[in-house]
Amino acid sequence: MSFFDKKQMITEEEALPGRNTRMPVAALHTVTGHSMTNVPEGMEVALFAMGCFWGVERLFWALPGVYSTAAGYTGGYTPNPTYREVCSGQTGHAEAVRVVYDPNVISYEQLLQVFWENHDPAQGMRQGNDVGTQYRSAIYPLTPEQEAAAQASLERFRAAMEAAGDYRHITTEIAPAKPFYYAEDEHQQYLHKNPYGYCGIGGIGVCLPPEA
């Protein structure tokens, strides 16, 4: 694969080898004060990719019912990748956010609404000015119920786009979750640590219709 061909997905055989050593993870979330790794009893996990993970993580940590969030990499092949490796396009991973949430306070359906309404799901291997396979739109369900909800929400959002006169093809990947690798600490809660930092995500002005 050409070094500059960042919009072309690689194969597993082409992926960088990675490493066995996991990325160090801070014990506590800078904003919520909760564990960055534990999932308390009764809580659930969701994985979303919708462009640069700095802005995406901030979207989700601000929601009532969200226990913690983490920026990381998933959907590809390279184990325990670095940010530089992911940005090379040679890991197959997307920049993603892991959301731990209380389903008694906020539903997976409500998380899907935030997902669809806050980025452009029809841009292929980019999001705005951020170009590369790592910026693709993706939902990585962890359960059959999440997968069914994700697929149904895609169909509803497609219909809403068409009703608004937008007939572009939705390129959002919906695939069973692969291992999630935490990003380096400097990327965790980045826009809390750097309030004036870059945030390149934004919606297209279309709302996700509610379930029938």
Swiss-Prot record:
Q: Where is the active site?
A: C52
| InterPro entries noted in UniProt | Met_Sox_Rdtase_MsrA_dom, Met_Sox_Rdtase_MsrA_sf, MsrA_MetSO_reductase
Report which reactions are catalysed by this protein: L-methionyl-[protein] + [thioredoxin]-disulfide + H2O = L-methionyl-(S)-S-oxide-[protein] + [thioredoxin]-dithiol; [thioredoxin]-disulfide + L-methionine + H2O = L-methionine (S)-S-oxide + [thioredoxin]-dithiol
UniProt keyword annotations, A-Z: Oxidoreductase
The record's annotation in Pfam families points to: PMSR
Q: What class of enzyme is it?
A: oxidoreductase
Q: Name one GO molecular function term.
A: peptide-methionine (S)-S-oxide reductase activity
Name the Enzyme Commission number(s) assigned to this protein.
1.8.4.11
Family annotation (Gene3D superfamilies)? Peptide methionine sulphoxide reductase MsrA (3.30.1060.10)
One of the record's GO cellular component terms: cytoplasm
GO biological process, any: cellular response to oxidative stress
Question: Function, please?
Answer: Has an important function as a repair enzyme for proteins that have been inactivated by oxidation. Catalyzes the reversible oxidation-reduction of methionine sulfoxide in proteins to methionine.
Family affiliation? Belongs to the MsrA Met sulfoxide reductase family.
Q: Which NCBIfam families match?
A: msrA
What is the official name of this protein in its record? Peptide methionine sulfoxide reductase MsrA
